[in-house]
């Protein structure tokens, strides 16, 4: 089944009188959409109660939920501390997507920065292995540019 829906709430969502993300599922279902991406782009900041309510609404209206992990994930960073933070962001996103009733995390695995594309790619592959050892029970949906990176990440579902 193909899932289709927005990332976050659009201007038309608010123009229709909605105020909270919990209302998105009914609104989307009425529009014939069946997916919703909750964004943690600037941080993982949803409490357990809100996640519980959103999960109930998602299930009630048959709208599948995913999350977008923080934008500052970068498995091509040369700092071990920053790699550990990237792993932590994905791990915490996995915990939250499960609380929300979903099973997919969308994230951008790396950026080139001041390296060559080849250097960034090799570093990303090496550091991404740290994430794979966690055995997360979610599906990783990488937002990637470039064929080489795409071919590499297409083989991973965790």
Residue ranges and their predicted role:
Residues 1-69, 73-92:
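N-terminal pre-domain/capping segments
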Residues 76-158:
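Active-site acidic/histidine proton-transfer and metal-coordination neighborhood
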